[in-house]
Amino acid sequence: MAKIIDGKAIAAKIRGEITAEVAKLASKGVTPGLAVVLVGEDPASKVYVSMKEKACKDVGIFSDEYKLPVDTSEADLLLLIHKLNSDPKIHGILIQLPLPKQIDTEKVLEAISPEKDADGFHPYNVGRLVIGKPLFQPCTPYGVMVMLKEAGVELAGKEVVVVGRSNIVGKPVAFMCLQQNATVTLCHSKTRDLAAKVGMADVVIAAVGQPEMIKGAWIKEGAVVIDVGVNRVGEKKLVGDVEFDAAAERASAITPVPGGVGPMTITMLLYNTLEAAKRR
């Protein structure tokens, strides 16, 4: 039976370290500040924003929330970002996605100052990530890499298979693994014989957003499985992208859903905000 990689425990440890660092900065008169911008009334987005606010409060980071109506124009949102870019109290800016259809998401993300890009989505930061000199790393992939390190998983020389090619998780985590000298295969909806690709992996990172799409029988004996997916099945049940019980029979280590990668995402957002404040 696989060892469970406990995201809650790892996140709690890192948040403890962040709290100490924030206190150290505060003693020098600097309080890290995060601006969170929510446009509209999307229920999931509202939950995420309140979780981020609470997390900031818990570690001593100042958070400023901007709730804008769903019919906010792109020009008005860009004006707010411009204001936040020049606000010395704000070290990190987070735009809660998705944005309403009248707003060009790429244009908005590009308007954020790269030095305040706490989510790590600005093209400048993506480019730096690709060449191995990141300023900020996207929070979920960063969380995955920290979990692998904390679990004692050495990536150099290993076969890593990433399933899912999103700009938010799949692509950045593939580049991060490459920087750790892994041999990386990036799979997606057009990949032929996905089962065979997954079956050769020493480490599987699933980030496709399809409930239990990765079958336990595909997992190589002794592989490490990181499940980024969070999918609601029915009213209450949450499952990942991997068939957990069957995969846990074959893997050496696996992340659960919930309680795996999820807690790490907000933790790395806090870390990025702290780092931004340190650089000022």
Curated annotation (Swiss-Prot):
Q: Does the keyword Hydrolase apply?
A: yes
Residue ranges crossing the lipid bilayer per the database entry: none
Gene3D superfamilies in the record, alphabetically?
Leucine Dehydrogenase, chain A, domain 1 (3.40.50.10860), NAD(P)-binding Rossmann-like Domain (3.40.50.720)
Q: Which GO terms describe its biological process?
A: L-histidine biosynthetic process; methionine biosynthetic process; purine nucleotide biosynthetic process; tetrahydrofolate interconversion
* Gene Ontology CC terms, in alphabetical order: cytosol
EC code(s) of this entry: 1.5.1.5, 3.5.4.9
Residues binding NADP(+) are 164-166, 189, 230
* Protein's name in the database: Bifunctional protein FolD
**Which family, according to UniProt?**
Belongs to the tetrahydrofolate dehydrogenase/cyclohydrolase family.
> So what does this thing catalyse?
(6R)-5,10-methylene-5,6,7,8-tetrahydrofolate + NADP(+) = (6R)-5,10-methenyltetrahydrofolate + NADPH; (6R)-5,10-methenyltetrahydrofolate + H2O = (6R)-10-formyltetrahydrofolate + H(+)
Q: In which pathway does it act?
A: One-carbon metabolism; tetrahydrofolate interconversion
Protein's job: Catalyzes the oxidation of 5,10-methylenetetrahydrofolate to 5,10-methenyltetrahydrofolate and then the hydrolysis of 5,10-methenyltetrahydrofolate to 10-formyltetrahydrofolate.
Give the HAMAP family listed for this entry.
THF_DHG_CYH (MF_01576)
Origin superkingdom: Bacteria
One example of the protein's molecular function in GO is: methylenetetrahydrofolate dehydrogenase (NADP+) activity
Subunit: Homodimer.
InterPro entries, per database record: Aminoacid_DH-like_N_sf (IPR046346), NAD(P)-bd_dom_sf (IPR036291), THF_DH/CycHdrlase (IPR000672), THF_DH/CycHdrlase_cat_dom (IPR020630), THF_DH/CycHdrlase_CS (IPR020867), THF_DH/CycHdrlase_NAD-bd_dom (IPR020631)
Q: Is Oxidoreductase tagged as a keyword?
A: yes
- What's in the keyword line of the UniProt record? Amino-acid biosynthesis, Histidine biosynthesis, Hydrolase, Methionine biosynthesis, Multifunctional enzyme, NADP, One-carbon metabolism, Oxidoreductase, Purine biosynthesis
Name the gene for this chain.
folD
